[in-house]
Amino acid sequence: EDDIEADHVGVYGTTVYQSPGDIGQFTHEFDGDEWFYVDLDKKETVWMLPEFGQLTSFDPQGGLQNIAVVKHNLEILTKRSNFTPAANEAPQATVFPKSPVLLGQPNTLICFVDNIFPPVINITWLRNSKSVTDGVYETSFLVNRDHSFHKLSYLTFIPSDDDIYDCKVEHWGLEEPVLKHWEPEIPAPMSELTETVVCALGLSVGLVGIVVGTIFIIQGLRSGGTSRHPGPL
């Protein structure tokens, strides 16, 4: 089947429900980014950015009704079919900063977890091997073309050369939790020998510049002096 090419793609009303666990979600996406989801516990619409909610609105009851229908259908299919549970896939995680890292400047770490199936996962942040909960936000499960899912977890932080970070991923498809490590890359300080060589090169280049400049000045003066003698009439 050929892929459909389009400038923009909206995925409206993605409804997921699975059992056991009574886990579900209702989301809207635009160009692969989450637009909003319906909080099933609070029964309210949660916008990815508050500004989105100022431009339009969505009645959370629509999402809750979809979840109820999917739950009902799943229960019927489970009772009437000799089903085989789907295989668990091993998710893949990558950690990277949102912006170029400058020590002491606020930034955001992003943990991108792909190939999630089924859509049940724990993503936690560790700083110096200790759990971090402040400044953490994660998206809902976003659908891939192959019907697996991906999810992003964000951690706001201030880079320091004393801190190291890990994104911890736990999933049924993993034999053990996976840790994706990240720490700021600090340029190594120059050694005394390197500093001496750099200074010597700089001094040499400066001396060469002075000599070359002096030569040009002398040649210019000679050329100017010659041009002042009048030729024969």
UniProtKB/Swiss-Prot annotation:
GO cellular component: external side of plasma membrane; lysosome; MHC class II protein complex; plasma membrane
Segments of this protein annotated with the region Connecting peptide: 183-195
Domain Ig-like C1-type: 91-183
Superkingdom in the source lineage: Eukaryota
UniProt topological domain (Cytoplasmic) ranges: 222-233
SS bond partners: 111-167
GO process annotations (BP): adaptive immune response; antigen processing and presentation; antigen processing and presentation of exogenous peptide antigen via MHC class II; antigen processing and presentation of peptide antigen; positive regulation of T cell differentiation
One GO MF term attached to the UniProt entry: peptide antigen binding
Residue segments, region Alpha-1: 1-88
Main location group: membrane
Protein name: H-2 class II histocompatibility antigen, A-R alpha chain
Organism: Mus musculus
Native organism taxonomy: Eukaryota, Metazoa, Chordata, Craniata, Vertebrata
